Amino acid sequence: MAGAIKTDRWKRGMSNPLSRIATRVAYGASQLPRVAWYVGHSLAMRRLAETARRRDGGAARQHAHTKAPVPDRRRLYADMAMLFWQDLANVEAGLYPLPADHDGSLFTLIHRSRLFFEDLPAIHRRRERRAHNEVLSEETRGKRPRYYLQNFHFQSGGWMTDDSAERYDTQVEVLFNGTANATRRQALPQLREVFAGRDQRKLRLLDLGCGTGRFLDLLKQVWPRLPTLGLDMSEPYIRHAKRHLKRWSWMRFIVGKAEAIPVPDNSQDAVTSIFLFHELPPKVRRIAFSECARFLKPGGRLVLVDSLQHGDQPDYEGLLDLFPQNYHEPYYLSYTNEDFCALAADCGLTYIRTVKAFVSKVMVFDKPATKTGHPHL
């Protein structure tokens, strides 16, 4: 209950005008430098890519293209601002405390920035040559499913190396212009609905595809004593997550596949998955979704955070076309056309709502409660 008490105290403090002003100043002081840092990386990355293309004497491939509308930079920045206003509104409403992004020390930021820029030439080379199978080798073959052994995002090492895990969060924040953590936090109000008034120590949550543990870090800031299980197929990413989350207790991690999750039926009060489902082949994606339904308790909640899909935001349609062309995302197109409401119905889950969050969205599903289940709604 400690996390809930802390959040309630924070909410009461928001009724004080001075506290509200202080909160807004603190929020801006933490988020604006992050955005500037990662937008700066994004602009530098684009300039370096253009320089590399001119140096190479033109394109070695057909460049990304779309006939669908693409938002201009002014629109993108306006929608980024809307996401941050929503993030701040959630803080002021007491849905979660003023967040700490835990990006690390200045030395750590510079180290990860160096790793990011050092990998750009190799990423450019792979993108121009459409090379994405360097991860597949005699050493890795058979250790992971074939669909997993690729250079996703054209990054070195795919998901299979410690350097990849160290670079990953910088790459994602650059791609999202510093909004990735704010996007992840939009899942927290959906969990608060089902956790409110309950002893967090007696609940269970599984984060599917936990990666480097950034969402679990944000989750623990609200429910520090909530027992959580992080599952990922990458041992290096799990190792990174353990280091990043060493400040928290009540945590376990396992290496495993989303399509064969080693947990009992009806064992989890909530399941979360952040930016995973667009990385899965259609068949695996549907099996993974059914697995989530299997081990959710009656009355439990599934919260997915992932990319927008076709039809969600008409003037963003072009971005959905360009993304898999610029970044190696072989299963993204099928994801953008996946009917998750139909999947939910087939698995016995009830669709609750979708909340848009800049270029992403939060999808919420519940497993109907039995007569003895927890009536959280």
Segment roles from a protein language model:
Residues 2-142:
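N-terminal accessory segments
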Residues 206, 214-260:
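Class I SAM-dependent methyltransferase SAM/SAH-binding core
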Residues 259-271:
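A short acidic, Gly/Pro-enriched loop at the edge of an enzyme's catalytic core
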Residues 201-211:
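Conserved class I S-adenosyl-L-methionine
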Residues 286-298:
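A short glycine-rich, Lys/Arg-flanked "PGG" loop and its adjoining helix->strand segment in the class I
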Residues 286, 303-347, 351-355:
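C-terminal alpha-helical "lid/dimerization" subdomain adjacent to the S-adenosyl-L-methionine
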Residues 347-377:
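Core SAM-dependent methyltransferase catalytic element
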Residues 167, 178-201:
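Conserved alpha-helix/loop element of class I SAM-dependent methyltransferases that forms part
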